[in-house]
Amino acid sequence: MAGEGGELTAALLKKTTENGGEENDELGLKEKVWIESKKLWVVAAPSIFTKFSTYGVSLVTQGFVGHIGPTELAAYSITFTVLLRFSNGILLGMASALGTLCGQAYGAKQYHMLGIHLQRSWIVLTGCTICIMPIFIFSGPILLALGQEDHIVRVARVIALWLIAINFTFVPAFTCQIFLQSQSKNKIIAYVSAVTLGLHVFFSWLLVVHFNFGITGAMTSTLVAFWMPNIVQLLYVTSGGCKDTWRGFTMLAFKDLWPVFKLSLSSGGMVCLELWYNSILVLLTGNLKNAEVAIDALAICINVNALQMMIALGFLAAVSVRVSNELGRGNPEGAKFATIVAVFTSLSIGLVLFFVFLFLRGRISYIFTTSEAVAAEVADLSPLLAFSILLNSVQPVLSGVAVGAGWQGYVAYINLACYYLLGIPVGLVLGYVVGLQVKGVWIGMLFGIFVQTCVLTIMTLRTDWDQQVSTSLKNINRWVVPESRDANQISSEE
């Protein structure tokens, strides 16, 4: 089987590379940049919009819960910030392995393999989600151990049980998004997300304000908002929207699960270490003395930074698709060029936002607060916010290159060293020992991100893209299944 798949893939890659090279030779640099930019934005724009919409669902829920009462708001915030973000990081990270598999298979025109990879990822992520469930079931003791007050924990335990159902939405959400992104078909996700956000506002008002159902109403609307786009995505994938890449359910999805799990695990490590890093910033600053105003200002800065991260994560998705597609095609120059265009596009946006936030300084805080003291503190922190935005315009893109090329295991070790062995210790020293408080912790963590970005930049610049194509070819050969074995696998065995 491997030999047959290898010969087929090698022949296909040779043909595609030759054709791609001839086409590229006839184009000038401006035309190449324009064509690559269009391919990049086809994936990036819907991805960015989808992430804003999904983030908006949580903000809408938070707003309505805040009108129920301060205890409910505190309980909602802690469960979403600590529990859901923890599971979200694990599942998003593990799902990113699908980007490598689907992207390279699509580039190599092994279209039938995308559906098999998708189903394997469903199995792996569903098993992982079940393993995470005890965190939500026993959320009470966990939150008490983190120092939360009893009256908040009592409400948080109820919300945590609702989050179990929301947690399972991440399985089809992340996998179907990546499956569609690999084919540049993710516009449908953006449309559905926009409609869902509007409906969520209406249902939240109806259940929380009009019928006064409290937390039950807010969480019911949130659950519907999380599940609705997933149902549409699943119907789109399985009902004819992806005829070339979805050939039906197959028993082959249950084979070769261990290699998929290992790749998913390394991907999970890479992404988790990044997502949890920002959460640790909040935990560390929360223990500083006399830092109430600074922490309020930090919360505003983190919210602004989170919104900018939606753009960066959109480019992460786009460049991972472009790099994996070109490697699958056997086009090393295309993968390299896609990386360059993505980095410079994202960096250009980051530079604009960098100067905007340096200019706005404390004025941005009045969107969130009327406190003059908090505004002054935001102005003091604004240079750090601006540099965070600048670094976040490059670092996620390089992580996207790693996903597209399948370097997740290496980047996980880089993240561990730069973030947790370098950034956090430096932040602790500057914040607690030197006495720089919140600024010191943030400077230390920015230092970790800067070092990580430098390492990833050097790693990308020194990449032998021809060798990377050979590695991708070997991976494709290892995973490939002849189409004849895939077709109607379940029905034939029955």
Curated annotation (Swiss-Prot):
This is Protein DETOXIFICATION 22. The chain crosses the membrane at residues 40-60, 78-98, 123-143, 159-179, 188-208, 217-237, 268-288, 299-319, 340-360, 384-404, 416-436, 441-461. Its main location: membrane. GO terms for cellular component: membrane. It is found in: Membrane. It comes from Arabidopsis thaliana. GO terms for molecular function: antiporter activity; xenobiotic transmembrane transporter activity. GO terms for biological process: xenobiotic detoxification by transmembrane export across the plasma membrane. Belongs to the multi antimicrobial extrusion (MATE) (TC 2.A.66.1) family.
